[in-house]
């Protein structure tokens, strides 16, 4: 997709950030309740700092804009972004936990998110979270998110670390009923990297985030493609966060492997993986205008939408800044800023008018 002559960016155009993380200020202390230190806990200190701890160790500092809906609206207004599609922080997935314990946390997060979306309907849409370690409970909570809480879908991790120490990739047969339910409900599914592969061997230089995250997204996309999940569920609406990680950028290698060793690669789906670039959605946060241009040319402007990873340091600090550096005509801008997002979410633009 090569854009026509660049036109001035319309500041009045609706802008929707599809990748924005959100937490309540406080959540149930399941580490204390169940004696399991792996559950994340929040500590608010006397000097005004807010820190998440996991396994008794510092994990991440967060700020009031992580949970204050009006502060977030005001922050986004500086960049003419009106709408945030909020999802939890992946450390909250807790797929390793007992399913009922994880469900307790997920329901609290989903209830809080839904209340924000109800209170600020012109500024928020929501993607809940579900305990994928129990597909039955995941489907149950997905249905509650969509039918009762009126959220637009759910965010899931790039793989599932199970309570017994095993794990499922997204092609696991056990997970197919969840994806089938999402397709039947018309729910949007956001796949986000978490629990990055190789983290134990990459203790320095922030490598799990810089190297592991793109690899996680490629693993997840390849499993959805090669496992036949997308082929069997043509109505399934999946967006790969972080621009799909390395998947779109290594599709040539992936396709070559498919062609040269179908005995290894095409065991569950006989179709060329390249064709699924037009089945998946991707957010725009690739941190480089040349990379975004490649993503648009390879996947199509109709498959890409604004996403920032707000409010974290690795995210886009000025929402839409990379998009603004790519020559696009106004219809193409409209697709990236809101058209693709509305299609993925199944919402009319009037929802945010």
Question: Can you name each region flagged by the protein language model?
Answer:
Residues 7-18, 25-83, 111-119, 140-144, ...:
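Mid-to-C-terminal alpha-helical segments outside catalytic/metal-binding sites
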Residues 226-228, 234-277:
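Aromatic-lined glycan-binding groove of carbohydrate-active enzymes
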Residues 21-64, 197-215, 257-277:
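Active-site gating loops and adjacent loop-to-helix segments of metal-dependent hydrolytic enzymes
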Residues 10-11, 82-224:
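Active-site gating/metal-coordination segments in enzymes
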Residues 3-4:
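Residue-identity detector for glycine
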Residues 16-18, 84-86, 125-128, 154-156, ...:
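Hydrophobic faces of well-ordered beta-strands that scaffold small-molecule active sites
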Residues 26-31, 97, 166-168, 201-204, ...:
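Short aromatic-enriched loop/helix-cap "lid" or pocket-rim segments at secondary-structure transitions
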Residues 21, 159, 194-195, 244, ...:
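Catalytic metal-binding/acid-base residues of hydrolase active sites
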């Amino acid at each position: 997709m090569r854009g026509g002559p660049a036109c001035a960016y319309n500041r009045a155009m609706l802008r929707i950030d599809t990748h924005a993380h959100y937490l309540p200020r406080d959540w149930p202390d399941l580490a204390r309740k169940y004696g399991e230190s792996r559950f994340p806990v929040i500590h608010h200190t006397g000097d005004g700092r807010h820190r998440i701890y996991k396994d008794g160790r510092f994990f991440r500092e967060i700020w009031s804009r992580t949970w204050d809906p009006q502060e977030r609206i005001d922050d986004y207004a500086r960049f003419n972004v009106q709408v945030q599609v909020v999802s939890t922080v992946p450390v909250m997935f807790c797929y390793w936990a007992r399913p009922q314990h994880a469900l307790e946390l997920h329901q609290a997060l989903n209830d809080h998110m839904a209340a924000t979306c109800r209170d600020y309907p012109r500024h928020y849409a929501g993607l809940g979270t579900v305990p994928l370690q129990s597909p039955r409970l995941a489907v149950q909570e997905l249905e509650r998110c969509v039918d009762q809480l009126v959220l637009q879908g759910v965010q899931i991790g790039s793989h599932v670390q199970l309570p017994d120490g095993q794990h499922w990739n997204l092609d696991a047969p056990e997970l197919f009923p969840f994806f089938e339910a999402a397709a039947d409900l018309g729910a949007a599914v956001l796949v986000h990297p978490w629990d990055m592969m190789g983290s134990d061997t990459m203790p320095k230089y922030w490598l799990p985030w810089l190297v592991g995250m793109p690899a996680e997204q490629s693993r997840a996309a390849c499993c959805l493609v090669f496992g036949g999940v997308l082929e069997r569920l043509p109505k399934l609406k999946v967006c790969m966060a972080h621009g799909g990680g390395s998947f779109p950028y290594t599709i040539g290698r992936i396709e070559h492997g498919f062609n040269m060793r179908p005995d290894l690669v095409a065991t569950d789906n006989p179709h060329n993986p390249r064709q699924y670039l037009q089945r998946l959605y991707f957010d725009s946060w690739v941190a480089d205008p040349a990379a975004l241009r490649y993503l648009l040319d390879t996947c199509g402007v109709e498959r890409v939408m604004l996403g920032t990873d707000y409010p974290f340091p690795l995210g886009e600090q000025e929402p839409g800044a990379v998009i603004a550096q790519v020559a696009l005509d106004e219809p193409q801008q409209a697709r990236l800023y809101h058209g693709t997002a509305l299609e993925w979410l199944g919402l009319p633009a009037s929802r945010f008018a």
